Amino acid sequence: MSRLATRFEKLQSQQRKALVSYVMAGDPQPQVTVPLLHKMVAAGVDVIELGLPFSDPMADGPVIALAAERALAAGTNTLDALNMVKEFREQDQETPVVLMGYLNPVEVIGYEKFVSYAKQCGVDGLLLVDLPPEESKEFGAILKQHDMDQIFLLAPTSTDQRIQHVANQASGFIYYVSLKGVTGAATLDTSEAAARIEKIKGMTNVPVGVGFGISDAASAKAMGSVADAVIVGSAFVKSFATLAADEAVEQTVNKVKELRAALDELV
């Protein structure tokens, strides 16, 4: 059983919700990332989503786009991000790590070479924002050969046909985008999201996580009440735009504790 399946099964047996945290690899400096991941896990993160820095992150709002700029300016590339997972695995063999990024850097390395090395480093799954399920047959087959999960996005605008298509292909978890727009958007319609998540869960046994717009205890609880996981990115990443690295790490860890406590109130 994969690390993701094991983690979700354990949480479901405890009637707890998964907290999935997004971190941009190499932001603000490469040496910050791995210690930050360990601290976030200790504070209550269940699954890590590690962003691959890319120069044209079209699905990301300004917070994460700027994080990618900082990481690239600090010299972080795709292979560096994979090596961060490898270093993380020296101390943590249990916490699932999913890479989130864009197709171009993966194509530059080559599908087989990238996936093979990612697996070797301890990566559990991959979400490529600009690779829709209709075009992912070749890449998905390579992931399957290496026992890695392929995670897809669904949105408020997704048709029933698209939902079913993703439900048939996805593994690990499905990422439901709770807002129309880019990451870090401000307003969250919990009732609409709840209805859509119920619909998705009616079509698949794959866990459903919800992200975009979750930034505090109230929104985490609202989404956690209907989804298997809440996915938080911009609320963590934004600290690194304005604070010194050590202060930003401390603020991020405190935010993890706040969200973890909120989700655990749902038990």
Swiss-Prot record:
Record keywords, A-Z: Amino-acid biosynthesis, Aromatic amino acid biosynthesis, Lyase, Tryptophan biosynthesis
What pathway annotation does it carry?
Amino-acid biosynthesis; L-tryptophan biosynthesis; L-tryptophan from chorismate: step 5/5
Say yes or no: keyword Signal present. no
Q: Name one GO cellular component term.
A: cytosol
Which reaction does this enzyme catalyse, per its entry?
(1S,2R)-1-C-(indol-3-yl)glycerol 3-phosphate + L-serine = D-glyceraldehyde 3-phosphate + L-tryptophan + H2O
Q: Where is the active site?
A: E49, D60
Asked if the keyword Repeat belongs to this entry, the reply reads no
- List the Pfam families: Trp_syntA
Under the heading HAMAP family, the entry gives: Trp_synth_alpha
Subunit structure of this chain's protein:
Tetramer of two alpha and two beta chains.
What does the function comment of this entry state? The alpha subunit is responsible for the aldol cleavage of indoleglycerol phosphate to indole and glyceraldehyde 3-phosphate.
Per the record, the similarity remark reads:
Belongs to the TrpA family.
Protein name per UniProt: Tryptophan synthase alpha chain
Origin species, per record, is Acinetobacter baumannii (strain ATCC 17978 / DSM 105126 / CIP 53.77 / LMG 1025 / NCDC KC755 / 5377)
Its ancestry begins with: Bacteria, Pseudomonadati, Pseudomonadota, Gammaproteobacteria, Moraxellales
